[in-house]
Amino acid sequence: MTLLFRLLLLLLAALACLAQEASDNSESDPDHIAKLTDDVLWRLDFGGIADVRTFRYTGLPQTRTGTAPMILYAYSFIPKNLDRNTKHPLIVLAHGGVHSNFMTGGPANAATIVRELLELGYVVTAPDYRGSTGYGPAYQRAIDYGGKENDDALGARSWMLERYSFLDPQRVAIVGWSHGGMIALMNIFQHPEAWACAFAGEPVSDLLARKAYLKSMPKTMAESAGEEAANNEEEYRRRSPVTYAAQLQKPLLVHGNSSDETVHVVEVENLVKALQAAGKKFEYKIYQNAPGGHHFNRIDTALARQSRGEIYAFLAKYLQP
């Protein structure tokens, strides 16, 4: 089957899905259409090397007083040449945000990172945690910045381990950049029993420091954590990874960039100071004026590849793919 013909079949399947979604979901929006189209690209680009699937799982209720578990979405990538008769490590890859989703393109370069991880022998799952775009306005509005989204990433780990017996629960890492790095930090600090190690790249780490340099932060907090959180310093602390630095028990690697204009390096520096003050063993590197700013080690430069090589070496030390 030619590549063009395969693409045509996948696009026709996507159109059928769009028609069904449009009839089933009154909240269909352009982000949702873009998401379905991107799902086709994941399968087209990776179908030759991996079993690519989307799955639904459940998480904490959407509201504080609710009892019904919220339905969540995620991707799984399993290398096609994987020996399913032996145990393998798992990477939980948390995308950035605040509002975004797991997609093939853009500066986050997720497709390249997933491909590299698959080639190294990892199984990968990528949760589109509550607040992600592409699943309708209600799902996007359900964001809980620094809160339940962390549990959503943990839930994707649990679902994969329950579903696939060839995954080793002792060899699971969480990896993320930017807002995904924040989720990685919160998980390794608050749920050390679940993870062998974590990598956080240019992570949102200190929301009070962020509020000091980002005028829009109170608005972001109001929209993504509730009106009462907008100027509540205690809420900023409660939702900040730096607050929990003393709880670190597992290996952690952190990267920052002095020229990052999205997550200022002061956040990473504050995190490093908090970890050092608590006497924690961890690894970190703050690059000086690395070209590419916030995305410097996710692009396709020699420096980016070298930096990702350091990340993969760190992961391999603890996951042994």
Cite the ranges covered by each PLM segment:
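Short beta-strand/loop motif that positions the catalytic acidic residue
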Residues: L248, V254-G256, D260
